């Protein structure tokens, strides 16, 4: 890959963080609106959950098939093109008149919003080695803030003009961001001589050959499944008695998650200092404990907010640590590493959404919390019994 000819200035870091957050947010505007959308289309809770699942499966497909292109093509042009195509997907969602059309729009948006995952390795490439973890932490904080603040913004806009307004406004913002990225990003040409099938094949070969990548991908998969289990069903909890909250109020709970995400930013710095295994162990322990507070959230808003803060803090902390660790493996193949890791990550998110919607329908909030705590426990045991020892030794 060509040597970067453009310094990673603070202004460019901010632009890339906002772009990353805005891109990934497009997959999550629907979550606080699921109850409203379900009533609009006369859907059950589990059927409405397919809207979120479609976005995450589209995102997973984009991670696997589109993100590796960042190691093949000039990245500024690729990033801008994908940003515009994601905006088109949201236009389809905004104008949808059926569940099938809405699923199509959200799937297309998810497919092309993986532009966020081309921006992250680009930032890692532009950053100096001693600051790479901090830069990745900042960009990833932008990503998780986008996921969480999407709910707040969606709720407020839905209160003002209905749920369709959310997607009309978001599509315009994505188009404007494409213009800003065209003006702000440096040109970054790739020197790889692999063709597209070889690029995809190398993603799988890295998975087969690298134990650390497989470890971190599995941890990310299970961690993000936890995240999706909470946020997919929370709108149903808060829209029902005893809360009976509106879309706007439900969206405000995203602010608690945003605070937790910001608190995890130092995780990249700890990874830079060789403490990634400590950060991972501590984060997974807190993730399991967060479900206790979340369970009490069915009667206590304060307990729910505390649980959201802790869960989002740990999810983001483990995620930043994972990415900082894997970017050390093959510096010349960061887009392919991202493709492999993030495909696993969002497969976990899609599975978490399906599990959450089903758990809510059959077991209510207790069922959701049981599912989340079980997966958190499995995640911790997998790390502690096997992978933790292997990575510390490495």
Language-model segments: which ranges?
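Conserved MFS/SLC helix-loop-helix module at the cytosolic interface between two early adjacent transmembrane helices
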Residues: 61-99
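Flexible cytoplasmic inter-helical loops of multi-pass small-molecule transporters
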Residues: 182-205
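Helix-to-loop junctions at the C-terminal end of transmembrane segments
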Residues: 63-74, 262-276, 360
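Cytoplasmic helix-loop-helix junction between adjacent transmembrane helices
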Residues: 105-142
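Helix-loop-helix hairpin linking two adjacent transmembrane segments in secondary transporters
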Residues: 101, 138-185
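Structural signature of the two symmetry-related core transmembrane helices
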Residues: 77-91, 278-292, 373
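Intracellular juxtamembrane helix-capping segments at the cytosolic ends
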Residues: 115-127, 317-330
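C-terminal transmembrane helical hairpin of 12-TM major facilitator-type secondary transporters
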Residues: 277-322
